[in-house]
Swiss-Prot record:
Function: The key enzymatic reactions in nitrogen fixation are catalyzed by the nitrogenase complex, which has 2 components: the iron protein and the molybdenum-iron protein.
Protein residues bound to [4Fe-4S] cluster: C95, C130
PANTHER family: LIGHT-INDEPENDENT PROTOCHLOROPHYLLIDE REDUCTASE IRON-SULFUR ATP-BINDING PROTEIN
Catalysis: reaction(s): N2 + 8 reduced [2Fe-2S]-[ferredoxin] + 16 ATP + 16 H2O = H2 + 8 oxidized [2Fe-2S]-[ferredoxin] + 2 NH4(+) + 16 ADP + 16 phosphate + 6 H(+)
Quaternary structure note: Homodimer.
InterPro entries registered for this protein in UniProt: NifH/chlL_CS, NifH/frxC, Nitrogenase_Fe_NifH, P-loop_NTPase
Phylogenetic lineage: Archaea, Methanobacteriati, Methanobacteriota, Stenosarchaea group, Methanomicrobia
tRNA processing as UniProt keyword: no
Annotated organism of origin: Methanosarcina barkeri
Disulfide bonds: none
Name this protein carries in UniProt: Nitrogenase iron protein 2
GO molecular function: 4 iron, 4 sulfur cluster binding; ATP binding; metal ion binding; nitrogenase activity
Gene3D superfamilies registered for this protein in UniProt: P-loop containing nucleotide triphosphate hydrolases
Amino acid sequence: MRQIAIYGKGGIGKSTTTQNLTASLSTMGNKIMLVGCDPKADSTRMLLGGLNQKTVLDTLRSEGDEGVDLDVVMQRGFGDIKCVESGGPEPGVGCAGRGIITSIGLLENLGAYTDDLDYVFYDVLGDVVCGGFAMPIREGKAKEIYIVASGELMAIYAANNICKGLAKFAKGGARLGGIICNSRNVDGERELLDAFAKKLGSHLIHFIPRDNIVQRAEINRKTVIDFDPESNQAKEYLTLAHNVQNNDKLVVPTPLPMEELEAMMVEFGIVDL
């Protein structure tokens, strides 16, 4: 069982990428569980035909510890993928990161991590790598980390910060598997992300071009793999899935100092001095 966490700046398309990646892997015959670790609880919606399933934390609040059953918090979606949303605390109360810790512990106790699973994916909010959001890394749950980024300043800044957190918790066995570029059509984007990944000691595992079919699929409450499996964009996600499945380059990243990061952004024309 490979346990993989997908991190990335909010709004980067992390959940869309993760759902299309897991859908692609399922078409290759893999058995998968996807755990949404984002308070927005939108990590599995396209796999479930637009269903907003009940989150683990909402269920705990309404039913208590004794009232939670696995079939209440876990739904099966496209490709028979097991879908779970950890959810978040009530607004203004508690810590969303702690919710991830609670959810994963509950899933373990309920026997969700079955031996037949090939992959468990964690879709994690990644603007900050505080203790709770780092939990899949820190506790050694996820051994492989992929970061979704683009050629925009804040996306790369967030990716670099995530690598700082990953390097800190590397003794638990977690490694960076690569950078996934979810393109924003920025000039020189592929070259920038390739250079950034190499400076981290890693690689650009795939460049996903921008395509409006992603939005059309989401309007129809489906992944691209489900909506139009013969499309060019579906082939891009399938290539990503093959690259992840065959990836053996797992490293402890070397995050860039801020001066070097800014110099690289200037070199590629992303920011002006």
